[in-house]
Each structure stands twice: as C-alpha cells, then as structure tokens.
Curated annotation (Swiss-Prot):
Keyword Transcription carried by entry: no
Function, as annotated: Catalyzes the cleavage of cystathionine to homocysteine, pyruvate and ammonia during methionine biosynthesis.
Required cofactor names: pyridoxal 5'-phosphate
Protein name: Putative cystathionine beta-lyase
Family recorded in the similarity comment: Belongs to the trans-sulfuration enzymes family.
UniProt xrefs under Pfam families: Cys_Met_Meta_PP
Alphabetical UniProt keywords: Amino-acid biosynthesis, Lyase, Methionine biosynthesis, Pyridoxal phosphate
Name of the top EC class for this enzyme: lyase
Modified residues (N6-(pyridoxal phosphate)lysine): K210
Length: 396
C-alpha cells in the first residue's frame, strides 16, 4: 500500500477520492472497510489493559471504520490528524472550546454562519471569552484588532449567505505573529477546491453533512489540525466525549468516492445560473465569488481551484416595505427548488437569508437576499423554476 500511497500523492483528485482511506487487503481484500458495531473493546490481559498499548481501547476513541474516514480526510487536507463529530456545528464548537478559555479574546469574521455566531454570543460569553467580529475584507489590517489576550481567529471563506472572500494567508500570517491559532470553516469549497492548511490555517472544519455526504441523509462533521495543534485538538475531543458513529463514517467515506464528480456538476450548474441571473431586471446583483463582477473575485481566483453549488442573489425590490413580500412570493412559486436550510445534497434548495445579526459587514439593502443551493438537476429546468419565482415576485 505504501507504493500506492506514494502514487496517490501526485494523482488527480478523482483518483485520490476513489482510493484514499483504507487498504482493502487489511480486510481480506474487501473493497470497503467493515462497519464495526461495538462500544467495548477487549484486552488480551491485565497488563495490556493497564498500559492501553493496543490500537483500540474504547468505541469513542476510534474504530477501523472511523479511522478509515479520518485517514481519507487527512489525505485530502494534508493534516496531522482528524476527529469526527456528530454535526457540522459541533465541528466548530469543539475547537473553540479546546483553544480558548476565560479571559481570552477571539476574532470571528462577521459573515460567519449564524449558529456559530449564536454559540459565540451565548456559550463563549458565559465562559468568559470575549468575541469581536471583524469585516471579511480586512485582510492584513486585522493586525489592529489584536490584543495581548487574542488567542484565536475564526475564518469562513466565502462568507455565509453573502459569500465575501477573505485573504486567508494574510490573516493567518498576522495571527501567527501574535501566537493565535487560526481555524477555518471550509465547508463551501471542500479540500477539493481549497486546502486551508496550505494557506496558513491551523485547523480546518467541515460539515460532512454537505458535499462529502451529498445525499442529505447524514449528519457529521470533521475537524483536521496541523501537527502543532493536533494533540490539543485530540485531547479536547476526548475530554468532551464527542464522536462520530461508525455507520455515519462509512456513509461519508462512501460519499467521498463520488464527491469530485458531484462537485463538478454543482460548480458548473451554479455558475451557469449565476451568469444567467446577472443583468436581469429582476435581480439587483449576484453574490458568487467566481463571477468577475464580484468584489473579492480576485481572492477566489488566486487561492481557490473551483466553486461549489451555493450562492445568493439580491432580488430587485421597489423598497424595503416590499422586500419580505417579494421574497416570500418568489420562494412560494418554486416547484423544483425545495425550501430548506441545508445544502450540498443532490436536490436544489432556496431560502430567504436574514442578515440582521451582522455588526460590521452590513447586509445588502437593495432587496432581499435569496440563497440558492444548486443540485444536480438539469439547468434548463432550474432556470424555468426561477422564472416562475420572478413572475410571482413581480406581481407583488
């Protein structure tokens, strides 16, 4: 397998996704790893039990199934180790709890995922951690926000719902000069299109619920760390007793095999629709980093290899008093798009993004923000469905 591992390092992404994670000959040649259903692990003797020298000691600390997924993620991320947790949000909260303490100051991008903000404003505040939000366009200017007690920077690129890009290498360089750890939610791009650890990030976070699963049927998160921060992350996870289930790990590993192909379709279809939306009278503007018209497009072009299937547009409105009514009319007229909060699955989804919680990066004021998750349906059918939405909104 070592010869194969060496070959895979320089192979294309779909070849790597097909083969990473486990050696079939570790399991008598079976192409997929076993799903181990056991919480208890037996020891051969009292000495082994006392020293815990064997590889597996208890179900929460790993199984052959969960290890196969962790090894696959490490191969994709270039990380020293990965933990599995029950959801994408848990993948955010665990490193926070592992790397900050009472009296610390943390910097969090203002375009952050809403539930992450809620965690920061409630749980971290109760624990005595001060959170300050920064503008996603700040780049190296983040230096002015650092204090002697700043211990962590949490980034998310692109931003949630409005998709602002960040200068991740510049932010990471500043943070490291001040001795702060940098973590990033990279769910949008996945390691297929962006590898955070290659750009200075210490801890990479993914909601595997999204593209790694691809079928809207699994909840799971992964957190991957570089060598400097791996032991502390692993300790935090063990102390908190949070782990991913073997069945879920198996399904995510299964999803990885086709993730590259699915992402190609999501990327191609979403960008096609985003370009089609630009310049329409129904649309005030399109928020997609891969569009040359997008303000931080240059950062996407510099750092990312592609884009996923989720973006937003601002629905044209005659004034703020009609904004919500137009958004609801648009959404209620859709028949192929479902109305749902998640993304990364095979099906297209839409929602009205509420951005009133932002404190630094103000939300668009020229109309309601409609977020689209573009699935794998035929683009012509999705465009026809969007036309139905526009017709309904124009009648308001």
């Amino acid at each position: 397998m070592k010869d194969k591992d060496s070959l895979l390092q320089n192979a294309g992404i779909n070849t790597r996704l097909t083969h990473i994670g486990n050696d079939p000959f570790d399991y008598h040649g079976f192409i997929n790893p076993p799903v181990v259903h056991a919480s208890t692990v037996l020891f051969p003797n009292a000495r082994a039990m006392e020293t815990r020298t064997q590889k597996y000691t208890y179900g929460t600390r790993g199984t052959p199934t969960t290890d196969a997924l962790c090894e696959a993620i490490d191969a994709l991320e270039g990380s020293a180790g990965t933990i599995l947790v029950p959801s994408g949000l848990a993948a955010v909260t665990i490193p926070f709890l592992g790397f900050v303490a009472a009296g610390d100051h943390a910097l969090v991008v203002d375009s952050v995922y809403g539930p992450t903000r809620h965690f920061c404003d409630t749980m971290l505040k109760r624990l005595g951690v001060e959170v300050e939000y920064y503008h996603p366009e700040i780049g190296a200017g983040i230096e002015t926000l650092f204090r002697s007690n700043t211990k962590l920077v949490h980034t998310e690129a692109p931003g949630s719902n409005t998709f602002e890009m960040q200068d991740i290498p510049a932010i990471s360089a500043v943070a490291h000069r001040h001795g702060a750890v940098v973590m990033m939610d990279n769910t949008w791009a996945t390691p297929v299109y962006f590898r955070p650890l290659d750009h200075g990030v210490d801890i990479s976070i993914h909601a595997s619920t999204k593209y790694p699963s691809g079928h809207s049927d699994i909840l799971l998160g992964t957190v991957s760390a570089n060598a400097e921060h791996w032991e502390r992350l692993k300790e935090a996870n063990g102390v908190l007793g949070i782990c991913g289930a073997p069945d879920d790990a198996y399904q995510i590993l299964r999803g990885l095999r086709t993730m590259g192909l699915r992402l190609e379709r999501h990327y191609e279809s979403a960008l096609d629709i985003a370009k089609w939306l630009e310049g329409r009278d129904d649309v005030a503007r399109v928020l997609h980093p891969a569009l040359p018209s997008f303000p931080s497009h240059h950062l996407w072009k510099r750092d990312f290899k592609g884009a996923s299937g989720i973006f937003s547009f601002v629905l044209a409105a005659d004034g703020p008093e009609k904004s919500r009514a137009k958004a609801h009319a648009f959404l209620d007229a859709l028949r192929i798009f479902g109305l749902g909060y998640s993304w990364g699955g095979f099906e297209s989804l839409a929602l009205h993004a509420y951005l009133n919680d932002r404190t630094v990066a103000k939300a668009p004021t020229d109309g309601p923000v409609i977020r689209l998750q573009i699935g794998i349906e035929d683009v012509a059918d999705l465009k026809a469905d969007i036309e139905r939405g526009f017709a309904a909104a124009s009648a308001v």
